[in-house]
Amino acid sequence: MLFLKEEKIIDKENVIGSNIRRIRLEKGIGQTELIRDLQLRKIAITRETLVKIEGGRQHIKLDQLKAIKDI
């Protein structure tokens, strides 16, 4: 893992994205529900962004990762 100035985390092996998906599914939380909870916490994220993060096509921001951890 490597941190950039913009507080995005580079995850070349998509460990973070795949773990977010796995844990989300284990908890029975849908993407829409997770996005709603994050937006209520003032985290700027869309369902499209979550799909890209889980699929390894977009880097996650540090504030997004911290908020997901708390759900």
Predicted regions and their residues:
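A short, Lys/Arg-rich alpha-helix, primarily the initiator
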Residues: L2-K27
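Short alpha-helical DNA-recognition segment
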Residues: G28-I53
